[in-house]
Amino acid sequence: MALPILLDCDPGHDDAIAIVLALASPELDVKAITSSAGNQTPEKTLRNVLRMLTLLNRTDIPVAGGAVKPLMRELIIADNVHGESGLDGPALPEPTFAPQNCTAVELMAKTLRESAEPVTIVSTGPQTNVALLLNSHPELHSKIARIVIMGGAMGLGNWTPAAEFNIYVDPEAAEIVFQSGIPVVMAGLDVTHKAQIHVEDTERFRAIGNPVSTIVAELLDFFLEYHKDEKWGFVGAPLHDPCTIAWLLKPELFTTVERWVGVETQGKYSQGMTVVDYYYLTGNKPNATVMVDVDRQGFVDLLADRLKFYA
């Protein structure tokens, strides 16, 4: 039986590819998709969800727009990474359907209530919507199987020296998620920076030759340009968000550890840092499964295999 999931995202090139991967995978039942501000402004990320679902001919999936800003801070966006639209590069279709007439939290709550079994929440943007759901609907915590997030890092940040972008945008929300008591799976930069897509991988996707694989290749063409900056030392572009979906499909591709994670909300230099108690120094019980390594070739092969679904 397919695993029911709720996808909360802020598309964003890698979010868009996570949607493509999820909807090409019969093991997953995508119940709804919600959008958050993050990689771009809230109206643009919502539009990008609708554009992607129009492209994939999945306008049956309920969509709702979420929080327009973080819980306690002003919004930061990553337009330098994702461009003016949030999905610069390919020519994507205009949306052919409208979002639900409700908020992201309302759609999430409705989806959880109506599901016969606990639902996995996959969150690939800032954690604002998920935190609002947890705070406003404590009665639904038992309907959440786990929360799989792309965010954080044990080591280096990518937005500040200490912080990864998604967590930095709304650290208070991320702290609520990690301390919720619900199992959290963290795909942080420690693993996503190893999940790099090289130029030859992009050409492999393009050669699959269907409209969706072509769009994915064009998304990656644009995404790679930002990551060519020598400061990163990358061979390709790290495909952060699809690591969450890939872990659900093939957990054997990933090495994980069980650790306690907290989020720094106050620090002078470290706001948004995910503090991972790797050596069990705090005495706190582990609250997260933390991804630390990935079989890069296996990850690329999975993407290539699932892109053939759209032939």
From Swiss-Prot:
Keyword Hydrolase attached: yes
PROSITE patterns, per database record: IUNH
GO biological process per UniProt: nucleobase-containing small molecule interconversion; purine nucleoside catabolic process; pyrimidine nucleobase metabolic process
Keyword Hydrolase tagged: yes
InterPro entries, per the entry: I/U_nuclsd_hydro_CS (IPR015910), Inosine/uridine_hydrolase_dom (IPR001910), IUNH (IPR023186), Pyrim_hydro_RihA (IPR022975), Ribo_hydro-like (IPR036452)
Classification via Pfam families: IU_nuc_hydro
Active-site residues annotated for this sequence: H240
An annotated GO cellular component: cytosol
Domain of life assignment: Bacteria
Keywords from the UniProt entry: Glycosidase, Hydrolase
GO molecular function (one): purine nucleosidase activity
E.C. number(s) listed in UniProt: 3.2.-.-
Family listed: Belongs to the IUNH family. RihA subfamily.
Function summary: Hydrolyzes cytidine or uridine to ribose and cytosine or uracil, respectively.
Protein name per the record: Pyrimidine-specific ribonucleoside hydrolase RihA
Species the sequence originates in: Shigella sonnei (strain Ss046)
GN (gene name): rihA
